[in-house]
A protein has these predicted regions:
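Conserved N-terminal subdomain of the carbohydrate kinase-like
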Residues: 16-21, 25, 44-124
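Positively charged, low-complexity intrinsically disordered leader regions
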Residues: 1-23
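Conserved beta-alpha-beta core of the PfkB/ribokinase-like small-molecule kinase fold
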Residues: 124-188, 204-205
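A short helix->loop->beta-strand "cap" motif at the edges of active sites that frequently abuts
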Residues: 43-44, 143-147, 192-196
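Short, acidic/turn-prone active-site loops that include or flank metal/cofactor-
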Residues: 31-32, 101-102, 152-157, 175-179, ...
Length: 286
């Protein structure tokens, strides 16, 4: 059921999360998570664009995307290993181990052509991130007038922000510091060009900055946390999906931000009750 008049495209990573403690594997990756959460959230259209490997775990991710009704018409399947990441859970918190740097995807540069760009323009925004190997295409998309949502990591360097944030419309990252340090970090990122900048801080909630004021959103606390995998992805997804819908309805921008932050907090809490990033687990053998 469509609840939000939003069209979203995830461009970049897909992986399989291998849970070593339970020998279950789950589909994941920042961009795949975005598409799955958007479907759960009730958007008009969700699509994934990226490279798959040619092995069994690639087929597993493809089958889940098909089951969810996520568009994959711009994907390519390359000969080689699909991306995977090993992890375990400790008291519901995810702990990452070994990973294969995206498999064949990490070795194959993206080059967007005019037809790709026309396709991307059909969506309200494209989402990608710093584990997606898409950085070389950010300028190309920006110059084509495409709005870009980008997930920086907590280990993104100052130089990385300075190089890529100027191409970004909506910037997201996680942050560990106190309120004052968080606000300074937000100001720094915003000064580089993005319209909106968001910091998520786990149980401390979120702080967002639009260049005029800060917005704070407490985390929605729940008792039955199962797995925090995808908590940040689900927050940014539901915020963006709701925010775009609110703007299309003519809602004042500041009110749209406040409404969307509340919705995002609730949705992210719900996602923490699921196994894996969004479920769809399958047993695997070493």
């Amino acid at each position: 059921m469509v609840k939000y008049n939003t069209k979203v495209l995830g461009f970049g990573d897909n992986v399989v999360d291998l849970y070593e403690h339970s020998h279950m594997m789950y589909p994941g990756g920042n961009c795949v998570n975005l598409c799955a959460y958007s479907k759960m959230f009730g958007v008009e259209r969700a699509a994934y664009m990226g490279y798959f490997g040619s092995d069994d775990i690639a087929e597993f991710v493809i089958s889940v995307l098909n089951e969810l009704g996520i568009e994959t018409v711009k994907c390519k399947q390359l000969v080689g290993e699909n991306g995977w990441s090993k992890c375990t859970l400790r008291d519901g918190d995810r702990i990452f181990g070994d990973y294969n740097e995206g498999g064949v995807r990490g070795k194959t540069p993206y080059i967007l052509d005019r037809f790709d760009l026309e396709y991307i323009k059909e969506f309200d925004f494209v989402h990608t991130g710093n584990y997606c190997y898409t950085e070389s295409q950010l300028k190309v998309m920006k110059e084509a007038g495409i709005k870009i949502s980008f997930d920086f990591s907590d280990d993104s360097s100052k130089e990385y922000y300075e190089k890529y944030a100027p191409y970004i419309t909506y910037a997201f990252c996680s942050f560990d510091g106190d309120d004052e340090a968080a606000k300074e970090h937000l100001k720094f990122i915003h000064s580089l060009g993005p319209e909106l900048v968001s910091l998520t801080r786990g149980s401390k909630g979120c702080i967002m900055y639009d260049g005029e004021q800060f917005y704070t959103q407490p985390a929605t606390l729940i008792d039955n946390v199962v797995d925090t995998m995808g908590a940040g992805d689900s927050f940014l997804t539901s915020f963006m999906d709701c925010y775009i819908d609110q703007l299309k309805r003519g809602t004042d921008r500041q009110e749209a931000i406040r409404t969307s932050l509340k919705e995002a907090s609730k949705f992210a809490a719900h996602v923490c009750t699921l196994n894996g990033a969004f479920g769809y687990g399958k047993p695997y053998e070493d």
